[in-house]
């Protein structure tokens, strides 16, 4: 099996968005998995050198087990935030204690398989909502998620097997979302057509519509946005 690298992705728009959180997460994963760590300053210097000739870009960097760092820059003009269709997965995934879920790794088989079996395409603003074998909602394949419950937005608990996203961390710290400590976010409690918040450090926060019955996707996406606001 090919060795998996650690990686991070963020938005550069004059600043590398949430860079300290990205470096902190990568360092923690490197320590946990036995990857050589070249140091935060070394990585930051490589990133700043890579973006110096662009004003806005998608920035991705990888860390090999030997401690080698590679940086990829994709310049962009604007950041589209089209509403996403979030499709409930057809089957549970083994996410608990899965290194590829709780760390950000280039081995993304669990996410690729979910996209494929649900015929979802990122190019069509589609993603898939995963849940574990206990029925607890975890995350989408490229986003953390939050659902509106009891007057507030709540996000799945890390104990169910999901990535501790940097944007998730930011929203929790500023009180915009709250962690689900009551087990409310279960597959069987979801509602077809309900609004969901999707977030990562590249697209920041996007709106989405949950589709439990895919054939109703087009109809639901035409409905007026919910009056619920991110508080």
Curated annotation (Swiss-Prot):
This protein's major location comes to cytoplasm
One Gene Ontology biological process: folic acid biosynthetic process
Names of required cofactors: pyridoxal 5'-phosphate
Q: Which GO terms describe its molecular function?
A: 4-amino-4-deoxychorismate lyase activity
Q: Residues of the signal sequence?
A: none
User: Gene3D superfamilies per the record?
Assistant: 3.30.470.10, D-amino Acid Aminotransferase, subunit A, domain 2 (3.20.10.10)
What chemistry does it catalyse, as a reaction equation?
A: 4-amino-4-deoxychorismate = 4-aminobenzoate + pyruvate + H(+)
UniProt EC number: 4.1.3.38
What keywords would UniProt list here? Cytoplasm, Folate biosynthesis, Lyase, Nucleus, Pyridoxal phosphate
GO cellular component terms listed in the entry, alphabetical order: cytosol; nucleus
Q: Where in the cell is it found?
A: Cytoplasm; Nucleus
* Pathway terms, separated by semicolons: Cofactor biosynthesis; tetrahydrofolate biosynthesis; 4-aminobenzoate from chorismate: step 2/2
EC main class here is lyase
Q: Which family does it belong to?
A: Belongs to the class-IV pyridoxal-phosphate-dependent aminotransferase family.
Function in brief: Converts 4-amino-4-deoxychorismate into 4-aminobenzoate (PABA) and pyruvate.
Protein name (Swiss-Prot/TrEMBL): Putative aminodeoxychorismate lyase
Q: What is the lineage of its organism?
A: Eukaryota, Fungi, Dikarya, Ascomycota, Taphrinomycotina
């Amino acid at each position: 099996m090919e060795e998996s690298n650690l990686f991070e992705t963020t938005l550069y728009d004059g600043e590398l968005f949430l860079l300290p959180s990205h470096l902190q997460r990568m360092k923690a994963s490197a320590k946990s998995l036995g990857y050589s760590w070249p140091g935060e300053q070394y990585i930051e210097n490589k990133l700043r050198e890579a973006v110096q000739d662009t004003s806005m870009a998608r920035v991705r960097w990888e860390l090999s087990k030997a401690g080698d760092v590679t940086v990829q820059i994709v310049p962009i003009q604007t950041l589209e935030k089209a509403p996403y269709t979030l499709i409930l997965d057809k089957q549970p995934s083994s996410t608990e204690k899965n290194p590829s879920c709780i760390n950000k790794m280039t081995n993304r088989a669990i996410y690729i398989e979910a996209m494929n079996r649900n015929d979802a395409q990122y190019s069509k603003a589609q993603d898939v909502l995963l849940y574990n074998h206990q029925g607890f909602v975890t995350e989408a394949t490229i986003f953390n998620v939050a659902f509106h419950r009891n007057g507030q937005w709540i996000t799945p608990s890390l104990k169910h097997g999901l990535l501790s996203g940097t944007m998730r961390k930011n929203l929790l710290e500023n009180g915009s979302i709250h962690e689900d400590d009551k087990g409310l976010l279960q597959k069987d409690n979801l509602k077809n057509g309900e609004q969901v918040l999707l977030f990562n450090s590249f697209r920041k926060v996007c709106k989405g519509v949950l589709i439990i019955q895919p054939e109703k996707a087009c109809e639901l996406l035409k409905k007026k946005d919910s009056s619920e606001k991110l508080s």
